[in-house]
Amino acid sequence: MAIRCEKFVVSGIVQGVGFRYHTSHQGLKLNLVGYAKNLYNGDVEVIACGEPLKIEEFAKWLEQGPKTARVDELKREEITCREYQGFEIL
């Protein structure tokens, strides 16, 4: 089974609205591992690793985010895989 890792940077109203919590929950639901963390500029960085189809499904979810957030922009890039345990909120 191929594993892919991607880094996402989500911009918009994504801090202080439960975005990382919902992102972690969605990642776990899709059997992904990685993390979500706030950046100093107001964006959220998300690393997700798992099956390519699940990564695509996750990316579609990130484009919308939870109802409490407003996603204005989603940047993504494939990165070298590392070992993560679970889906952490940093």
From Swiss-Prot:
Signal peptide positions (record): none
Presence of keyword Hydrolase: yes
Catalytically driven reaction(s): an acyl phosphate + H2O = a carboxylate + phosphate + H(+)
EC category name: hydrolase
Residues at the active site: R20, N38
Protein name: Acylphosphatase
Keywords recorded for this protein, A-Z: Hydrolase
Transmembrane segments: none
Domain of life of the organism encoding this protein: Bacteria
Family statement: Belongs to the acylphosphatase family.
UniProt EC number: 3.6.1.7
UniProt xrefs under Gene3D superfamilies: 3.30.70.100
InterPro entries (UniProt xref): Acylphosphatase (IPR020456), Acylphosphatase-like_dom (IPR001792), Acylphosphatase-like_dom_sf (IPR036046), Acylphosphatase_CS (IPR017968)
Acylphosphatase-like domain mapped to chain residues: 5-90
GO molecular function per UniProt: acylphosphatase activity
